[in-house]
Amino acid sequence: MIAGYIFLLIAILSEAAAAAMLKISDGFARWQPSVLVVIGYGLAFYMMSLTLQVIPLSLSYATWSGAGTVLTAIIGVLWFQEKLNRRNIAGIICLVSGVVLINLS
């Protein structure tokens, strides 16, 4: 079971990194970040496929999408100086709460 969560963590991290590279790629106009987008998403989906061998789909996908969304928002704030308003923050709190509750069940 621990291996499944390690695979899931790698899937989340690589998906968020790929999303950041997608922004940097400037619509795939810059080839270096574009290559990293493909590698990042490829790794994310491969790790997710390994995760699904151990952790049920409902738990895996909810965690992957929720944690990935939160991590991507954090990257947006830290690297791209994006601003979060109160609704954004409330949404992130809801996502984190949902991911925690799903994993506790």
From Swiss-Prot:
Membrane topology: Multi-pass membrane protein
Entry keyword annotation includes DNA-binding: no
Primary localization class, coarse: membrane
A Pfam family assignment: Multi_Drug_Res
Subcellular location: Cell membrane
Keywords recorded for this protein, A-Z: Cell membrane, Membrane, Transmembrane, Transmembrane helix, Transport
GO cellular component: plasma membrane
InterPro entries: Small_drug/metabolite_transptr (IPR000390), Small_multidrug_res (IPR045324)
GO MF: transmembrane transporter activity
Transmembrane segments: 2-22, 35-55, 60-80, 87-104
UniProt record similarity statement: Belongs to the drug/metabolite transporter (DMT) superfamily. Small multidrug resistance (SMR) (TC 2.A.7.1) family. EbrA/EbrB subfamily.
Subunit architecture: The efflux pump is composed of EbrA and EbrB.
Function: Part of a multidrug efflux pump. Confers resistance to cationic lipophilic dyes such as ethidium bromide, acriflavine, pyronine Y and safranin O. The efflux is probably coupled to an influx of protons.
Identification of the protein by name: Multidrug resistance protein EbrA
Organism the protein comes from: Bacillus licheniformis (strain ATCC 14580 / DSM 13 / JCM 2505 / CCUG 7422 / NBRC 12200 / NCIMB 9375 / NCTC 10341 / NRRL NRS-1264 / Gibson 46)
Annotated gene: ebrA
